[in-house]
Amino acid sequence: MIFVGLAKFRKKPDKKDVGDTTKIIEEWKAKGINMLNWYWTLGSFDAVVVFEAESEKEAMKMSIEISDWVTTETLVAIPREEAVKLVK
């Protein structure tokens, strides 16, 4: 499944946070969560992450793990090609 995560930093990130994030991404990859794209953004959210996970439960586990650093809103994403097939 593909997800879009919207995140707001709880505090100003520093170099240690960036290094910790790199390590955590590798740990998630070993658990089957694959980061497809990651952007720092301007506006209501500080970051947007597009990732794959096996299920909603796995995506929720990831959100819980990072809740000390960021608040998140996670969306389930359906590729356009698949969504168009649902239109009658």
Regions found by a protein language model. Give the residues of each.
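General N-terminal targeting signals
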Residues: 20-22, 26, 50-52, 68
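Short beta-strand-to-loop capping motifs
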Residues: 7-9, 49-54
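An amphipathic, aromatic/His-enriched active-site/gating alpha helix that lines ligand/cofactor pockets
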Residues: 52-83
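Short S/T/G/P-rich N-terminal loop/turn motif that feeds into the first structured element of a domain
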Residues: 1-30, 34-36, 41-45, 78-88
